[in-house]
Design a protein with these regions (language model features):
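The catalytic Nudix box helix
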Residues: 77-78, 94-128
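DNA major-groove recognition helix of helix-turn-helix/homeodomain DNA-binding modules
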Residues: 10-25
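Short amphipathic recognition helices of helix-turn-helix/homeodomain-type DNA-binding modules
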Residues: 25-32
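Nudix hydrolase/Nudix homology domain
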Residues: 53, 130-203
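Acidic, metal-coordinating catalytic segment for phosphate/diphosphate chemistry
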Residues: 32-66, 70-72
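A glycine-rich, hydrophobic loop/mini-helix early in the fold
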Residues: 64-96
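Phosphate-coordinating loops and pocket residues in cytosolic domains that bind phosphorylated ligands
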Residues: 28, 110, 180
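Recognition helix of helix-turn-helix/homeodomain-like DNA-binding domains
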Residues: 1-7
Length: 203
């Protein structure tokens, strides 16, 4: 397969299964393919790969990170999703995304921060606040293990250093300002745990 061929990843996966080929050897030739490691419910690696966009197996989970970045003023770095995002366009959120094949949760959190908002987080300045396993939501197999990170960061923020175009703009906001965004329904609603689990000491 040539790199410039537009081949469906789903079809590739089926071809691999039919030919008993190693998917990793083939998918590397397909641009922009995001591959995840699969885990069981106990967070043990299954030794299987999964293509983003395909239906997850009922017994397979992937790692997801939410990354809250806080400065010494108690403000949080939040971002507005680009208008071309397929879900929640132009809504506000924290940094976040899926951990890709070969990464651990910390590596995924640091990569996502660089990709989305252009900041270089220091591993020692981060901590996992809590972990949640999400299964079936509204009849859909969700199957992820979500780590919620909090990083302390007082450095510069320049969206020009981001490596993707997923974010339209960024801002430092305090609890009350974030609450106002929620009240106007322009903050991703699944992040409402912020008030009880992330900024809980400021209640």
């Amino acid at each position: 397969l040539r790199r410039d061929e537009e081949v469906s990843l789903t079809i590739l996966s089926k071809i691999c299964k039919t030919l008993h080929a190693d998917f990793g050897d083939i998918v590397e030739y397909v641009p922009d393919a995001e591959i995840w490691d699969l885990y069981n419910e106990n967070r043990e690696l299954l030794g299987k790969d999964h293509i983003r966009g395909e239906q997850l197996p009922i017994d397979g989970y992937h790692l997801v990170v939410h990354v809250w970045i806080r400065n010494s003023k108690g403000e949080y770095l939040i971002s507005q999703r680009s208008a071309n995002r397929p879900t929640y366009p132009l809504m506000w959120e924290c940094v976040g995304g899926s951990v890709v094949k070969g990464e651990d949760s910390l590596q995924g959190a640091i990569r996502e921060a660089k990709e989305e908002v252009g900041v270089d987080l220091i591993p020692e300045n981060g901590q996992v606040l809590f972990t949640k396993t999400r299964k079936i939501i509204d009849g859909k197999i969700y199957n992820d293990i979500m780590d919620v990170w909090l990083f302390e960061y007082d450095g510069e923020v320049d969206l020009g250093n981001a490596t993707t175009d997923e974010v339209a703009q960024v801002a430092w906001m305090n609890r009350e300002q974030i609450k106002e965004l929620f009240e106007h329904n322009i903050f991703v609603e699944t992040l409402e745990y912020f008030f009880t689990e992330v900024d809980k000491e400021r209640r």
